[in-house]
């Protein structure tokens, strides 16, 4: 049975409506909700001469910014005070999704990249990587 719904939130203004839809789903199924933003290093961000320290600094800055964007969801009353907000970092998408503590019966929800027309049902590159590496079932909501 469904134990919790986690919403993957990239922190963009156009993705807030996906969070709102997941809030409604969590209420409908009477399960707790969590919102996660993934901060992933990905491939080498800079030439080797720059060093990993610069990449670590940029990743840490992005994670801090993501925490602010998540907090804004509560400030704007998009989500309730009981919703868990989390930033998860990783060197790649597999590592980031493995770093999450998943419950048995959990569902991961994410939105598509809104580009109009039929593109609304297609995932962007980040969404596709999340689906590929997710250890739990994924619900894809049209953006």
Where are these regions (language model features)?
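Short hydrophobic/charged patches on amphipathic alpha-helices used for structural packing
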Residues: 27, 94-98, 128
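Structural beta-alpha unit
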Residues: 75-108, 112-116
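Active-site phosphate/pyrophosphate- and oxyanion-stabilizing loops and adjacent acidic/basic residues
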Residues: 23, 71, 75, 128
